Amino acid sequence: MNKLLFLSKKSSTSNLYRFYSRAPINESSIKSSFDPKVVEEFKYKYWQDSGLFKPKSNNGGEKFSMVLPPPNVTGSLHIGHSLTTTIQDSLIRYNRMMGKEVLWVPGLDHSGIATQVAVEKELQVKQGKTRFDLGREKFLEQVFQWTDQYSSNINNQLKITGSSLDWSRSVFTLDEQRNDAVQTAFIRMFEMGLIYRSTRLVNWCPYLQSVISDIEVDHKVIEKPTMLKLKSRKKSVEVGAIHNIAYMMEDPMLAPLIVSTTRPETIFGDTGLAIHPLDERYKDYHGKFAIHPFNHERIPIVLDDILVNREMGTGVVKITPAHDFNDYQCGQRHSLPIVNILNSNGTLNENSTAEFEGVDRLDARSMVIEKLEQMGLYREKLAHPQTLSICSRSGDLLEPVLKPQWYVKCKDMADKSIEFVESGEIKIIPESFRADWSRWLTNIQDWCISRQLWWGNPIPAYRVIMIDKVTNEDLDIHLTETERLKQEKWVVGKNEKEARENVFKTYGIANAGEYRLEKDQDVLDTWFSSGLFPISSMGWPTATKNSDNDNDFSRFLPLDVMETGSDILFFWVARMVMMCSTLNNGEVPFKTILLHPMIRDSQGRKMSKSLGNVIDPLHVINGISLQDLKENLSKSNLSQQEKVTATKGLEKEFPQGIPQCGTDSLRFSLAQYPINGKDINLDISKIIGNRLFCNKLWNASKFVFNYLVNLNNLSINLYYNNNNNEKDQQQPFNYLESTTLIDKWILLKLSKLVEIVNESYKSNNLSIAAQSLYSFFQYDFCDIYIECIKADLSKPILSKQNEHSSLVLASVLDSYLRMLHPFMPFITEDLWQRLPKSKQQLEIANSIEIDDSLSIMISDYPNPSYKYHQLFKNQEIEIEKQVNLFLDTLKLIRSQKVSLGINEKTKLIIKLQIIGDDQILIKSSFNQLKDSFEKLLNSNLIIDENNNNDNNNNNDNNDLTNISINKFTISKELQISIEFDKEINNQLNQKLINPNQSNDKKILKLENFIKQLQDEIDNPDFKQRVPEKVQNIKIEKLNQYKIELKEIYKK
């Protein structure tokens, strides 16, 4: 009796699992239904402990490498991360099974602003303190403790979702080696002239007191006057209104100019008014001056056809160069003074007035209006739609502020990155994003990389401050800020020693007593460290291709694929290409950019906690009740109104909660969505459907196992010689050549599947692979093949044909499980281990040294080039024709039974009358499938290739008559008649005489079927989420129902 291999808990050894052999399995020895918790438990730990995630040398063969886009350490993984890991892990597992040396590096991003904000909030809630109360050093200690906790949570989530990452190579963007890479990159880019310091307008968050990046800016559209509640402040502020203010003219003969502004509080920074040079209304104001209402200084009237639109408002624009991006450009064109009116915390500074100094700029808005009213200069308030820029991290309104910052010159690097894509050195999938790539990089601006935070990669720069040799005072102490910024000197260095060496190299100052160094207290933008991730995760700058050809840097760069969300193509992917190629001798960091779209809810809405439509992958995997969903919501930091809205959203979206679906179901569902579309509308019902698919896979496998029990060792060895050892082209295939028509058909279908799936992986179109795998198993394997062979396999005597069919069952299931494994790793591992193993494999499994060599994840992936998958190719057309004729016959007879209202249990006589040139072929096919045909249709089948109607001798059932009720043609070569017993015949004749008595119910039933199918097909998500083959089946069924209904109405 052959032996099977299983995974089992291992006691008293380091590995959680061991392989062992025992008697073959049958239906009674595994659980009756699929339980994802039981199936998925322990397997990941076994894989990891066995070292299966590490690259295995293949003696110079092909390699495949990826890095996981490092999740922010700030919290839990969301459904978008699950899509990323599903796609990436599927690619990794596929290439590992293809025999390549595979590396997938995990990592976490320190997420500067998000992490600092989260820890500050926790500090305030738990201790009532700010970071300033703790001081920089102690605050950073708390942040590191916090990140340790959350990084563990994230890594556990990645393991739960089956991500086969090499954890021994895990990195963190603030660990010692990555921090050194960041410092090195900054210094080298500074020395190359790519990093420089400049004073410009930036997006400033007063709450964080830092610059923020464009990706951290939320844009909120306000249509009318609204009192807006901001997370960063207790008081609401009015927005959506524009205020008209009068500016008195220096020339008393000129009428005041009326300006419109949504931000009256910025009036203290006004240094000019602008009019259009061709505006006839203001031709007398050319070259004139207005008087500032608060400081009473003269401010010029400038002519500017760029800033001013004559058709908008009054046609006069106030210019505040220090606090508006457009005004700044205008101020530069006309050499206007730049007056900053804000402190770092958003309060007004000394450039306002004594009355306003220290007042928050949003509180000052109403105070300024009141003061202008007292002066008689306030005219009116009007409704005015506006778009607000809000910090996504703090919820505060952003302010354009003039600040000295560090910048990266991007133009040359961007041009080179465009060239990489145009030359094909880097491929972008979907290709539609090539245009975005070119457009974004063509119009790129220099990148502000400094942040005024405590948490992040420190900037390795020092300001050189000259000192008075006599007084020992700083020489710039008496300079204005503008003068000081113009004269300041900067050097770079990882430490003060390096910085002093650079002082001498740059400025020729040898005497350390002539100056002092002041370390820059800012940190770098998180995207700077992330931009280095492909090379820093491989050991750069310590490891290079010149240093050691055996390191990861030499072996695995460039990465084969960089897979990530399309929303960060510019913010992250483009910067990786620019920075890594610049720092690595012009070499690209990866060959292919694979982008997936944003995941939305089933209604196409963006997922948001405030809408109650966010899907937590762990909730899908483990299941959660509606009550628990509501309880989690109640603990969130949403406002009370947002909680009310979100609760309604939860009740609508998940009225029964979310049932336990398991990891495999979630992964398979995500993989089935095409990634070349704009967005993915995720429907929980699809995941639940794939949970049922898992159960069907489980039950079908049990069916297969039940028929493998009585196979002998010779059969098993034949099976393994011909299937698992497919690379050996010399093995005999005699037993497969003698299999039945339906066996050959399923093997042909399997071969086609192998071709489609492999091609899908090569083209990075994984949804085609996933949909094809679903369709093959659901329809070809289960609905057709298994149903057809049940009649033969159920016979009490085990024939050679039955044995061959059993081997085909095992063979197809084995190949299918291996193809499905990258998408559904847990259930496939469990079921594959239950398949029979060859003697050689058992010997390997029993070897302590290499007892991990029989996991499905390191088995061979089915390859269309193997001889096993080339069988019957020369018979393909003939086999397809025969089986399709058989299936069409089944379908039509079933349809006729439904049309006539015949009970499934009613015994039929079915006569096949074969005519034409292919009588022998058709007769052979129906003879081979006769048992299946009779079992599936509860019938007796009589075959007459000579069109002879005298078939009574073939009828052994005395209760059946030869009165033909229904005759029809299947094809030009095949006609069929159906006969019933006398009682059924009388009933049918009665229905034909009084059709309305039976037709009313039939019409109603058909109309309901038609409506259900039509509604499903008309659903906008139908084409996106339903496999093409299933779509065709449903459309065909709909048309069939319509024809049946039409025929009834005719009668």
Curated annotation (Swiss-Prot):
Record CDD domains: Anticodon_Ia_Val, ValRS_core
Binding site for ATP: 609
Presequence extent in this chain: 1-20
Coiled-coil regions listed in the entry: 972-1019
E.C. code: 6.1.1.9
This protein's UniProt keywords: Aminoacyl-tRNA synthetase, ATP-binding, Coiled coil, Ligase, Mitochondrion, Nucleotide-binding, Protein biosynthesis, Transit peptide
GO CC aspect terms: cytosol; mitochondrion
Enzyme category, top tier: ligase
Protein name: Probable valine--tRNA ligase, mitochondrial
Recorded family membership: Belongs to the class-I aminoacyl-tRNA synthetase family.
Upper taxonomic lineage: Eukaryota, Amoebozoa, Evosea, Eumycetozoa, Dictyostelia
Span of the annotated motif 'HIGH' region: 71-81
Span(s) of short sequence motif 'KMSKS' region: 606-610
GO biological process: valyl-tRNA aminoacylation
Localisation per UniProt entry: Mitochondrion
GO molecular function, one term: valine-tRNA ligase activity
Record's keyword annotation contains Endoplasmic reticulum: no
Domain of life: Eukaryota
Main location (coarse class): mitochondrion
Any Pfam family hit: Anticodon_1
Catalytic activity: tRNA(Val) + L-valine + ATP = L-valyl-tRNA(Val) + AMP + diphosphate
